[in-house]
Amino acid sequence: MPILEVIALNAKDAEAAQEGGAHRLELVSDMASDGLTPSIATFKEVRNSTDLPIRVMLRDAKGFAPGNLKQLRRQAWELREAGATEFVLGFLDAGGEIDEGVTLNLVAELEGCAWTFHRALDNSNDVFRSWGIVKTLGCDTVLAAGSPKGVEDGLGNLKELVAQAPPALLVGGGLQQHHVPELLAAGVTGFHVGSAVRPAGWESPVEMASVREWVNRLV
């Protein structure tokens, strides 16, 4: 069955996503930086506001460089202590390749938690070579658009990547409703939206009706 994952910034977003029928949340802060690690307080508020699974972003700066690994490990530990059981992460090295060492170092702090490797894959030198690396790192999901330019440009790559699962392919990054039938036909079962369920932009909350419209598209 297809799933819809919705980006949430706070409890209000989480409640609207659940009411609209979403299946999972990606919890982040600071979308101006493309999504950073949320505070412990925000995580607790969201966890208390919804029954949906919550994947929490582990990233401390815009882009796909590792940043402060010690800080990220501390944040991961603190989030786990607060009850987080699912995460989102993934890094590139200075040469544009998947940073296996840093990723595995942080994953070690998760101790078996489910996690998504996020769109660093799209920004790597070769998405197919990178997929082969990422699938050895222990994630159960890869968030990708197939291209750094977004889903519209990456449709061909996505159709090839979904055939190489596992891990599961979660499509997001400029995803629009008109992409859904073609992706479903190719075997994609995971869809990820953010601004698409915020008609008034990132400064406004998730709209329940928009989430419901997306969920209905997946049926």
Please name every model-derived segment.
Residues 74-91, 95-98:
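Ordered, amphipathic secondary-structure segments that act as subunit-interaction surfaces
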